[in-house]
Design a protein with these regions (language model features):
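Flexible "cap/lid" loop of the alpha/beta hydrolase fold
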Residues: 175, 181-218
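Short beta-strand/loop motif that positions the catalytic acidic residue
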Residues: 303-305, 309
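Conserved HGGG/HGGXW glycine-rich cap/lid loop of the alpha/beta-hydrolase fold
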Residues: 38-132
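Conserved alpha/beta-hydrolase "acid-adjacent" motif
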Residues: 310-316
């Protein structure tokens, strides 16, 4: 616990000394209007079905990080058996079920075309939550060991989609000497390093604050405001239902978040703070990003970000794009007006078209 307290103290020191500002959360909550309470979500007939029973072709917990603070277990699922291999790398506090829309769209609906690999990072879900210093570089090494285990080692064979902290981990795959197997990199709502933009830093402090005891409804409300646009939150539930749709997209999100937070051992303070340490201290310089782009090929990289992102401010997406070489250098730009932090939810069907299109384009390139 001393290590956790030290990490928490370092993160608080890293953040600017600002009086916490609730204005953004207040505005979002006013705009989206009344949504279901925690009790109402739990009693909704769709709640037991919010995590779909998507049966994987393969599911294991494997040892990683021997000699790197481990070994400890990483849990993964492989869905589909198609020739196009996609690994989905989740962000801070998210677990593999958060990818279920993409797991269904790629690994089940088109299982003959795609093989979809999802997993829980160290510190979350069904993976172990060791108490040690996490870094995005070490978490990328976990990913490399997972790719080796499933045999995804051929040249230019793996399509990488990393969101938020997952995008930071994806940046480190090149440093982990895995660039030869990467077909292309998709950086979703992420940053090469955190610059002190007010909205982001306030919200990171907010995420730390979420770990201290308080009403679950208040926690969910704050995550909504951090990660999603008001326009999307207040729309009628767009996700396919088993029994009955939730009233709004925001209620659907709340149900998924509640299943994670109420599952014993899945979402812990220790694991969250260890991941937060890794994300908060991730740093890629402009020179390092140039090396990354040189190694992978700029035409094999996409940067996707929403202008309404209040978790990792849009300035980070613009910075990442520019320092990788920009559109003029061959990097694909996919910026979306008003979108929040979680493109796989807010623009699910467009997101699928974008990722499928990038896969098709890069497969035509010479290795």
């Amino acid at each position: 616990m001393d290590a956790i307290r030290k990490a928490s103290g370092q993160l608080h020191s890293y953040l600017p000394s600002l009086e916490f500002n609730q204005e953004h959360h207040r505005r979002i909550n006013e705009e989206i209007g009344q949504q279901l309470s925690v009790d109402e979500v739990l009693q909704h007939p769709e709640f037991p079905h919010v995590n779909w029973p998507l049966q994987p072709d393969r599911k294991e917990r494997i040892d990683v990080a021997a000699g790197r603070g481990g070994p400890f277990k990483i849990s993964y699922e492989l869905h589909g058996h198609g020739p196009r291999k996609i690994i989905w790398i989740m962000g801070l506090g998210g677990y593999m079920k958060t990818w279920q829309r993409q797991t269904k769209d790629f690994g089940h609906t088109e299982s003959d075309q795609y093989s979809s690999l999802v997993f829980d990072n160290r510190g979350i879900g069904e993976s172990d939550k060791p108490l040690l210093r996490y870094t995005t570089f070490e978490m990328a090494k976990d990913v490399v060991e997972l790719l080796d285990h499933v045999g995804w080692i051929e040249s230019r064979s793996v399509h990488v989609v990393g969101i938020s902290m997952g995008g930071m981990i994806a940046q480190e795959l090149v440093s982990s000497s895995r660039e030869s197997s990467l077909s292309h990199l998709n950086f979703i709502s992420t940053a090469p390093r955190i610059v002190r933009t007010l909205p982001y830093m306030e919200n990171v402090r907010n995420r730390i604050d979420l770990m201290w005891p308080k009403a679950l409804g208040a926690q969910i409300s704050k995550v909504k405001a951090d990660c999603y646009s008001a326009e999307w939150l207040k729309k009628p539930d767009e996700t396919e239902s088993i029994v009955q749709p939730f009233p709004t997209n925001g209620d659907r999100f709340a149900s998924g978040e509640l299943t994670k937070r109420l599952l014993p051992g899945a979402f812990t303070r220790q694991g969250f703070l260890c991941q937060l340490y890794a994300a908060g201290f991730h740093h890629k310089s402009a020179a390092q990003l140039k090396q990354l782009a040189d190694a992978v090929g700029r035409e094999r990289i996409m940067v996707l970000h929403g202008t309404g992102d209040h978790m990792i401010d849009f300035v980070h997406g613009k910075m990442l794009l520019a320092e990788l070489g920009g559109e003029e250098g061959g990097v694909t730009k996919s910026f979306h007006d008003g979108m929040g932090h979680v493109a796989p939810f807010e623009i699910r069907h467009e997101f699928k078209r974008i990722i499928a299109g990038r896969i098709a384009e890069t497969e035509k390139m010479a290795s």
